[in-house]
Structures are given as C-alpha cells and as structure tokens.
Amino acid sequence: MIHHNNYPQLRIELASPEQIRAWAERRLPNGEVVGQVTQASTFHYKTHKPERDGLFCEKIFGPIRSGICSCGNSKSVDEKKEYSNFCKQCGVEFTDSRVRRYRMGYIKLACPVTHVWYLKRLPSYIANILAKPLKELENLVYGDTYPNLFLARPVAKKPNLLRLRGLCNYDNQSWIKILSRFFSTRGFEIFQGREIATGGHAIKKQLASLDLKSVFNSAYLEWKELSEVESTEDEWEDQTIQRRKDFLIRRMKLSKHFLHTNIKPEWMVLDVLPVLPPELRPMIELSEGDVITSDFNELYRKIIYRNNILLDLLLKSAFTPEGLIICQKKLIQEAVDALIDNGIRGQPLRDSNNRPYKSFSEVIEGKEGRFRENLLGKRVDYSGRSVIVVGPSLQLHQCGLPREMAIELFQSFVIRGLIGRHLARNLRDAKNIIRNKEIFIWKILQEVMQGHPVLLNRAPTLHRLGIQAFQPVLIEGRAIRLHPLVCGGFNADFDGDQMAVHVPLSIEAQTEARVLMFSHTNLLSPATGDPIAVPSQDMLLGLYVLTIENSQGIYGNRYYPNERTKDPISSFSRIPYFSNYDDILRAKEQERVDLHSPLWLRWQKDLRIITSLTRELPIEIQYESSGISFQIYENYQIRKGQSEDILSLYILTTAGRILFNQQIEEAIQSTLEASQHRNQQLLAITI
C-alpha cells in the first residue's frame, strides 16, 4: 500500500532489466533465489495445485492459503511480526496469502524483444532516436525480409569474418546458405553475435551504441542551420524543411529526456519480462468443471512456451537450421506484442473462440481502464446520478431532487431523525419505515434537506463552475430539475445530459459549499469575468414565444367585417379593453383571452412614452359630437378633449407581455429592497 506521506507523487518510466529482476527476485533463508517463471503450466489437473515454477507457483508468489504451504503444513501467522520461515520440502513461505496480490515474477527471454509501445506507437521513439524509417526497423525487428535484410556491425577489437557495416540488403542468398552449412547452431550464434544482428538484438545494439550528447548536439546544429534558411518559393520544399525541423526537435527532446532521467535507450528492448501477480490475473474453476481464466494467463503461456522452444533450439540442437531460429524469435516477438498491445500490428492474436485476447494496453487505457476507472476516479458513497430537466419555477440557488434519490442520499440523516424523535426504536425499525415509505418520513426528509446543500457536477469538469452547490427541493419523478440560468457554467443543456449529485458531510465541506460554491454567488466567468448566468437559447425562445403576438395585430378585424359593432371606434372593436394588470390576468385565467391575442391596456404610469412617436401619423381619427377625438396609432391610441389635452392613453399589448413585464418589475423591486436592507445593516454596523 502506498502511503501519501512517503510517496507524494507517482512517475511512470522505463525500467532496467536489473530493476525488473529486483521486483520479482527473493532470496529464501536457504540461499535459493526464486522469482523466475520457467514453466507455462498453471494448475495440476488432478491435484488442482499450482505447478512448480509455473504461472501460479506458490514458491514464487506466496501461498494460496495463509500460513499453509504447498505440502499442507501450516504455521500460525502473526500480523505484527514477519516470519521468514518456510517449508523445507516445497520452499513455500508461511505467510499471508495476500502477498499473491503484489508479488511479481519474471521471464528471462531467450532473445531481446523490442517493446512495441516504443516502436509502433506514434511517434515512434525508437525510430526518432535512431533517425531511421519505421518501416525499415519493422522489417529488421520481425525478420520479414531476412536473410535479405540484416544489420552488419562488427564487434570492436575482434577480427572480422565479413567486412560489412550498416544495414545490408543482398538479393543473392548463396553466401548465407554456405555460412549456415559451415557453422553449427552454436557456431552460427557466435558468428551472428559478432558479425550480423537481426530482430530485437539488432535494435538493442544500435541503441546501446548511441552517444546521447552527440545525438543532441548534431540535431541542434542541423536544426539551427535549417532555421537560418530563408523561405523558398517552392511550397513542397518548404514543407520538407519544416518536417525535418519538427523531426529534429523531437529527437532533441527525446535525447534530452534520456540524459536528464538517466534512462538508457536500450531499455526500450526487453531482456526480462515482468509477470503480474496471480491475484491480478485469476483463474477460477466453476462447479461444472469449467475454468474461467484471465487472458493474461494465456498470453504468458504462449510467451513461455515459445521461449522454451527457442532455448531448446539454441542449447540442445546442434544442427538446427538458422532460419528456424529466426522464425522462432519472430514468434516470441509477436507473443510479447500481443501481451503488451494486441493487434497493434494489424491482425490480433485470438483464442479458440476467435475472440481477440485482452492485452495490457486495453486494461489500462480508456475510460474504463485502471487509471481512469480505479485510480483517478472512484465511486463514492452519498452520491447519485440522473438526467437533468428544466425547472423554471426554481430559484437560481435551488435544484429539484427526486424523492427516490433524496431518500437514499439522506437516509442516514433521516434514520437519525426517526430515532431521535422516538419514531423508531433501532436501526432496523427505521429502515423498515423508510422501506415502507411512511408519509411522515417526507416531512423529516424536508427538514433534513432544508439545512443541507448538495453539490451538482457535470462531466467533464473543465473549470471550477463545473461543480456548484444548490439547495435541494423535493420533487416528483426521477429526473433532476435545474434552473436554466446555471446551464452556462456547467455547459449543459436539456437534451439528455446527466449530472451527479454529492452530499457534503463534514461541517467544513458544507460551509465551503454555502460560502464559495452556491450558484447565485458564481455569476461571472472565472476566466474572463464576463457574466455566465445569461439566458440560453431555450430561455430566449421561451421569452419570444411568451411575448409574441399574432401576425394580424390590430388589423385582424379587417378579415371579419360582419362582426363590427356600433362602438365609436368600430374598426378596432374586436380588441378588448382593460384598465389594469389584474383584469388581464383574470381574463387569462377565465380563458377569455390567450397569451398572444392583442388587447388594449390603459396606461397611467408615464405618458411620456409617446413623446418619441409624435411624428407618427395616426391610422384613424374619430370624433364624437362632444368634441372628444380618438387618435388610433399602430401600437397605441390617444383620447383627447376639446382643448387637445390627453384624457387617456391605451397601449396595444398581449397577456404574455403583461406577464413578462410583471415578473421583471417584481424581480427589480425585490433586488432594490434587498439592497436597501443590506445598506441599512451596514449603516447600523458602522454606527
């Protein structure tokens, strides 16, 4: 277990062969060193015990049962004291079985194997540091064109049998046939080690011979020369120069990183392969006799099996054809590639059911990988998740929480309230009351929620407004309701987005939520300072629909000439008249008018609104016998007396606009009252 006080950070880097051995090797009290896995077997088919030196060997990874060795002998294990005693017959330590979760093993490869991440992943680090085409290195690693393609690099201070140097390509293969007949297998291995190299061995030789300082200096000088070259008129040539400069920058960064971290480039070629602990790649036998196993076990078995075959070819067979050895090395390379990143070279390695094996890369990468699923992000208690819908009736700092979700999130608080009020005798009774959904539990839940904020989070949390605090309100249904103005901070909309709910438990967390994280205190963008709680498209469309009027307006009666009355302003008699807001809202409730139908409202607040429209010509002017005139305009009408003084003013509006205006007035009035109250408090404090 990693303790945060001792290990403040975690860094992933290349491991040397010695480091991999140190992870796995252990020295027993009798002096024997264990840790190397040499057999591809797992469990014995009769005894169901792990095979010795296999992938589940108890001697290497620890006992399956705590304090019991492979022979069945037992010894008590004291957790406060480490026991180095072990069984002299089977060599298994008397220790806790939990060591099988972190004890590793290793496989000593019969030939160097190139790490596929550093060869095939883009950018290819091996190709960059060697300054060679990736296709050329692939042909060399996998022996696709051997013996036509190999690396000729004689060993220093030794006589040369062939005067070759560099990457050689021969169409005439007669010489290689003569050499393979002249040398035995061991003799050819000695010759090959001195004169030619293929596969991962060739890559390792080139990486080991690199002088990183010289690589950095030469790349820097070339980049400096290219930077001084002025732009040509040839676009193709300019692009070629730019690509070369980008390559040199990557090469300088890579060599500089190797120098600063004391990592050797040849570590990108594997000589020792680590084996995961058995508990991380389990094998389970079902009651019917079937076995469920991790894909890692099958991939490790293929590597060990092919590695042992190559060892036999090199050690036991005196006249094995050299081409067979090259082919076996290629099989080992492909098996290790499948373990690390299956399918990276095209066709993945498959099992008997034609299903691709799940490699190490698939286990750790992606949203459901080990890092993002288990290490960087974990499921936590007192949290929930649901779809968000709009809640226009909510205040800015409120959110609607479904009853089903709220009773689960605040269950412990409700249980404490039930027991504290003597409505339940113990924990079991309280849970039964909650399970039966008694009516009075909702009242207790509301009291609990009233003083307890919740945190809403929408992934991805790209800035601090991605998680904000709200006052929960109980609602029906199963969706979380959210005020539309806070969607800007979350970058959310109501087309199926989901949000997570978290309950802050400690007093410090609740205080921080109330003081710093409440939505009504986060109205400005932390990046730009611009308002972020602004109406979104949904709100703008809603306001547009609320305040729209029918397309005909005051001219609607022109299409109904038979409905005119004897009113003095008969041309516009179909449009109703109202003296105040209350009459309009009452008519709306009685469905005598709808939201969009035009109506005349007597305006008594400010008659100066017509000053800007004095130049507008009236549509119609009507006179009464008493001398009173009616001047009808497109959006208002004026009633004047004999002395041309304004007796009354009516404006053309709709019920929707009246509702909108009333809400705006109430909001402004409440803001002014709150501001005045706050100023009075500050004044009282200063006095």
Curated annotation (Swiss-Prot):
Complex formation: In plastids the minimal PEP RNA polymerase catalytic core is composed of four subunits: alpha, beta, beta', and beta''. When a (nuclear-encoded) sigma factor is associated with the core the holoenzyme is formed, which can initiate transcription.
Class of this enzyme: transferase
EC number(s) per entry: 2.7.7.6
Gene Ontology CC terms, in alphabetical order: chloroplast; DNA-directed RNA polymerase complex; mitochondrion
Reaction equation(s) it catalyzes: RNA(n) + a ribonucleoside 5'-triphosphate = RNA(n+1) + diphosphate
Localisation per UniProt entry: Plastid, Chloroplast
Family: Belongs to the RNA polymerase beta' chain family. RpoC1 subfamily.
Cofactor binding: number and manner: Binds 1 Mg(2+) ion per subunit. Binds 1 Zn(2+) ion per subunit.
Binding positions (Zn(2+)): C69, C71, C87, C90
Protein name: DNA-directed RNA polymerase subunit beta'
Cofactor(s) named in the record: Mg(2+); Zn(2+)
Organism encoding this protein: Angiopteris evecta (Mule's foot fern)
Gene3D superfamilies from the UniProt entry: 1.10.40.90, 2.40.40.20, RNA polymerase II, clamp domain, RNA polymerase Rpb1, domain 3
Biological function: DNA-dependent RNA polymerase catalyzes the transcription of DNA into RNA using the four ribonucleoside triphosphates as substrates.
Alphabetic keyword roster: Chloroplast, DNA-directed RNA polymerase, Magnesium, Metal-binding, Nucleotidyltransferase, Plastid, Transcription, Transferase, Zinc
Binding site for Mg(2+): D493, D495, D497
InterPro entries in the cross-refs: DNA-dir_RpoC_beta_prime, RNA_pol_asu, RNA_pol_N, RNA_pol_Rpb1_1, RNA_pol_Rpb1_3, RNA_pol_Rpb1_3_sf, RNA_pol_Rpb1_clamp_domain, RNApol_RpoC1
Chief site of localization: plastid
GO terms for MF: DNA binding; DNA-directed RNA polymerase activity; magnesium ion binding; zinc ion binding
Short name of any one Pfam family annotated for the protein: RNA_pol_Rpb1_3
Gene Ontology annotations of biological process type: DNA-templated transcription
